[in-house]
Amino acid sequence: MLAGGSDGRVAVPLWLDPLSLTAPTDARALRTTDEAVRGIAAIMATRFRLPVPDRVMVHVYDGRRAFEQGLMRDARVSPVQASKLSNFAIGVGARGQVLLNDRPADRTQRERLRLIAHELTHVSQIELAGGEGRGEQWLAEGMAEWVAFATLERLGLDTLERRRQTAMAGLRSHATLLQHLDLEAHGTPQGFAAWHLREGSLPVYQLAFLIADDLIERRGLDAMRAYFASFKRSSGRRGNFDAAFGLSLDDFEAAALARLKTAAAL
């Protein structure tokens, strides 16, 4: 992807002029990190109308230890949190920057592009909300997965429907996740982190994707953008959810849980 620095870190500033970005349709045009970030940003801006900052700093780290150090140095994450994150995360999207762990080196192109799209979606959410850590964390993660999969679909590498089927199959193997969603508790970064550390990252992220997919199907991506943008005006999580989606978080949770149980035949 990029040549490594002596400290296992490469930092690349990218200027993203929305007017000059061209959305690719062929993944072969996205071989380098620079090409991938620019191409995916173009897809997000033109296809999903998601804002991307004019300048994004991309940090690529050669392994977990360098990634942990980068989280502290470049993202200003506390040492304790950086240690926890580096144990399971392979990427982080922060305000105006994307941090990527470049290991394992044999990561497939599809997974590399998914990761970049996921983290760039977090950068966009932060742009919309005017800051980090705003909005429901399960929804931020689920939306990031949805945009990433839709981006792969645009590039001919995957489909949303296949990801839905894969996620639903995963839920059937982790039926305890559908006993009680408790979205309020999983709405904070700390609550979401505890959830996926307890239940496993893959099934929890699959569930978050399915919940976000359900919400996007019923209310649309415009409502999702409006939800995150509402945090520039108000920090009220429940009120912002009600206003953007036209129903309370409790009512949505009950309806979504019933639909998921039916779809999973549980």
Predicted features by range, described:
Residues 11-136, 236-237:
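Juxtacatalytic substrate-recognition/specificity segment
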Residues 16, 87, 195-196, 212-213:
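Short, flexible segments with low predicted structural confidence
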Residues 41, 45, 209-216:
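Short, amphipathic alpha-helical segments that act as regulatory/interfacial helices
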Residues 4, 87-92, 138, 183, ...:
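Compositionally biased, low-complexity repeat tracts
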Residues 1-11:
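Disordered inhibitory propeptide/activation segment of secreted metzincin zinc metalloprotease zymogens
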Residues 131-210, 217-266:
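Acidic/His/Gly-enriched intrinsically disordered linker/tail segments
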